Amino acid sequence: MPIIQGPHTTQPAPDFTAWGLAKFPAGGRNITEPHFHDCDEFVFMIEGRMRMRSEAIDYELTPGDVLVTRMGDVHEVTEIIEDTVYFWAETELRGQRRTGHLIRGKDAQ
């Protein structure tokens, strides 16, 4: 099995997957715009504390927490409470198979 190195990458394969390591200092707000994906996404908290909103529900994440957003769920990082490190991973694309952050009203679901 190959080892894939690097903190942020995409896999050049038909099913596409992406992952990355995110680091943010305390005090940030509205880090990402409300968006959705044509895949599921997992956010694994490593250190710090932050708030995310998914489908209009606010969550405070701390080390060891995992937030799962399903394909089409609108979500965003709303506040970095403490210096934060998290790992995110996206599954294979489904539906229209579009990559990146998709915005309701701009990118039809």
Regions found by a protein language model. Give the residues of each.
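A short glycine-rich, His/Asp/Glu-containing loop-to-beta-strand
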Residues: 1-34, 39-40, 89-91
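Short, conserved beta-strand element in jelly-roll/cupin
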Residues: 36-52
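Structural motif
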Residues: 42, 49, 58, 74, ...
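Short acidic-glycine-tyrosine-enriched beta hairpin
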Residues: 56-72
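Ligand-binding loop in jelly-roll beta-barrel domains
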Residues: 71-97
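Acidic/histidine-enriched, glycine/proline-rich intrinsically disordered or flexible terminal extensions
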Residues: 96-109
